[in-house]
């Protein structure tokens, strides 16, 4: 018994719940016999490392990622509006959702969870802000941020003033304004 997954599907343009499913998630590797024909679709053995490369619901990718990472028992709530992932909550905590971007930075309409986006190399938006001010000696100085030791990339390195991922539905400007408020306490 690995986890509980709650699926909620709302109608598009409405908060009406069309479908709700409470799923107990099990894994099994100690079984006997061979699968029989399935009237619900085609059965196929797929290598564990290939699963996330299949055409899956974005929420399914979250719990497959958790299983691959040997996450202990978890509770995952997935809310969809139509076929689009709108919210993901893991163990009572909101997960970060990004809108996938095309090569030119425009939104594709596909919403992905942060861990899935990073593990699959999916293009998503970020906003980077350089803050500078005039000074009398050199003419200009730039506010830099030394990255925390706990950061997953380049801990302890100096970086730009502020940066962060765009939340699903945000524009680049909205993301930039949110980040300088969250990281630096600035208001714009």
Show where each model-derived region lies.
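The catalytic Nudix box helix
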Residues: 1-4, 26, 47, 144, ...
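Acidic pyrophosphate-coordinating catalytic loop
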Residues: 5-21, 118-122, 152-153
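Active-site-adjacent beta-strand/loop module that shapes the phosphate/pyrophosphate-binding cleft
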Residues: 9-34, 105-106, 188
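Short, well-ordered beta-strand micro-motif
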Residues: 25-29, 45, 131-133
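NUDIX/MutT-family hydrolases
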Residues: 27, 36-66, 89-94
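Charged phosphate-binding loop/patch that engages nucleotide di/tri-phosphates or the phosphate backbone
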Residues: 69-95
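Acidic, metal-coordinating catalytic segment for phosphate/diphosphate chemistry
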Residues: 94-137
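A glycine-rich, hydrophobic loop/mini-helix early in the fold
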Residues: 126-162
């Amino acid at each position: 018994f690995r986890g509980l997954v709650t699926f909620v599907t709302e109608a598009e343009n409405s908060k009406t719940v069309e479908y709700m499913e409470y799923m107990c998630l099990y894994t099994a590797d100690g079984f006997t016999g061979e699968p029989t024909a399935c009237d619900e679709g085609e059965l196929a053995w797929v290598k564990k490392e290939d699963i996330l490369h299949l055409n899956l619901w974005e929420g399914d990718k979250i719990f497959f990622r958790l299983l691959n990472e040997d996450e202990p028992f978890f509770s995952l709530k997935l809310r969809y509006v139509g076929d689009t992932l709108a919210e993901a909550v893991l163990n009572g905590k909101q997960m970060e959702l990004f809108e996938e971007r095309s090569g030119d930075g425009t939104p594709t309409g596909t919403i992905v969870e942060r861990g899935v986006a990073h593990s699959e190399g999916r293009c998503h938006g970020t906003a980077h802000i350089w803050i500078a001010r005039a000074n009398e000696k050199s003419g200009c100085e730039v506010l830099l941020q030394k990255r925390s030791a706990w950061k997953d990339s380049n801990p302890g390195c100096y970086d730009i003033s502020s940066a962060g991922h765009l939340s699903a539905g945000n524009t680049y400007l909205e993301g930039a304004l949110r980040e300088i408020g969250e990281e630096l306490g600035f208001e714009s």
